[in-house]
Swiss-Prot record:
This is Anti-sigma F factor. GO terms for molecular function: ATP binding; protein serine kinase activity; protein serine/threonine kinase activity; sigma factor antagonist activity. Belongs to the anti-sigma-factor family. It comes from Clostridium acetobutylicum (strain ATCC 824 / DSM 792 / JCM 1419 / IAM 19013 / LMG 5710 / NBRC 13948 / NRRL B-527 / VKM B-1787 / 2291 / W). Its EC number is 2.7.11.1. It is an enzyme of class 2 (transferase). GO terms for biological process: asexual sporulation; negative regulation of sporulation resulting in formation of a cellular spore; sporulation resulting in formation of a cellular spore. The gene is spoIIAB.
Length: 143
């Protein structure tokens, strides 16, 4: 049963990354998360949005869309861009790999997302964009 859903669209500008992170964290707050859980979500969203801006659009602008759904204490977050896409998803997800060494990127974005979320899936088509789907189950805290 679908409990709640939100969609957010914003320009692919680095100054919007913190707005996106806080918006998704606020949406997830209805699950009464621990501080650790909310920090995990913020970090993962931050990395996904930054990837869309820097790698998807190569800092040239575009629109990033975030859809978030809460169902059975699980938060599903989709971060989508219509940028250049990822040629080799498996390679892109390797720790320390970056398509932009000129920007001194660490290549840890997907690794960070994987460490903070329960599940991550990447769908991409060269020239059409990328969708990152992340899931996190929230513990039920009893008083």
């Amino acid at each position: 049963m679908l409990e709640n859903k939100m969609e957010l669209k914003f320009l692919a500008k680095s100054e919007n990354e913190s707005f996106a992170r806080v918006t998704v964290a606020s949406f997830a707050s209805e699950l009464d998360p621990t501080l650790e859980e909310i920090d995990d979500v913020k970090m993962a969203v931050s990395e996904a949005v930054t990837n869309a801006i820097i790698h998807g659009y190569e800092n040239k602008g575009g629109v990033v869309t975030i859809c978030a759904v809460i169902e059975d204490r699980e938060l599903t977050i989709e971060v989508m861009d219509e940028g250049i896409g990822i040629e080799n998803i498996e390679k892109a997800m390797e720790p320390l790999y970056t398509s932009r060494p000129d920007l001194e990127r660490s290549g840890m974005g997907f690794t960070v997302m994987e460490s903070f979320m329960d599940n991550i899936k990447v769908e991409s088509e060269k020239g059409k964009g990328t969708k990152i789907i992340m899931k996190k189950k929230f513990a039920l805290i009893e008083d």
